[in-house]
Regions:
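Catalytic active-site module of serine/aspartate enzymes centered on a nucleophile-bearing elbow/loop
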Residues: 78, 85-124
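Solvent-exposed, acidic/flexible segments
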Residues: 25, 33, 37, 60, ...
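Short alpha-helix in the alpha/beta-hydrolase fold that links the catalytic acid
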Residues: 49, 62-73
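Short beta-strand/loop motif that positions the catalytic acidic residue
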Residues: 47, 53-55, 59
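The feature captures the conserved acid-bearing segment of alpha/beta-hydrolase catalytic domains
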Residues: 34-48
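Accessory cap/linker subdomain of secreted extracellular hydrolases
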Residues: 1-34, 38
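Acidic catalytic loop of the alpha/beta-hydrolase fold
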Residues: 58-62, 87
Length: 124
């Protein structure tokens, strides 16, 4: 799917299933195509301001290794890996099913460790 966006400049949502169509709907495709033109490591290295990189070790969408690549590209950045935090900044103590369910649980709070991390970074 990603390759089709990059190579062909779009995907016809009539040929893909409803779940994928929701993610790759035509209205989002221009954004996704432009987003693929950027390399996060190159972009973060250009920054001349303090940088805080936060990742959860329970993130289904962005692996810790991706945050580590950003840190390598910007050695003076602060990297914090928050235990049990997922992509939605929620603390997940269970496995994959609990993590997936959290995406629809608006009552699950943002992990306090995230808030403390951001606060300390701003105040420093």
């Amino acid at each position: 799917m990603i390759e089709s966006l990059a190579i062909w400049g779009g995907v016809d949502d009539g040929i893909i299933g409803p779940f994928i169509a929701a993610i790759f709907r035509p209205s989002l495709q221009p954004f996704m195509i432009s987003w693929m033109n950027y390399n996060p490591q190159i972009e973060i290295a250009k920054l001349t301001i303090p940088v805080l990189i936060i990742n959860g070790n329970n993130d289904l969408q962005v692996q810790v290794s991706e945050a580590e690549k950003l840190k390598s590209a910007k050695p003076d950045a602060v990297l914090v890996i928050i235990p049990n935090m997922n992509h939605l900044f929620k603390e997940i103590k269970g496995g994959l099913i609990e993590n997936q369910k959290s995406y629809n649980d608006e009552d699950l709070p943002i992990t306090k460790k995230l808030i403390k991390t951001i606060k300390l970074f701003i105040l420093k």
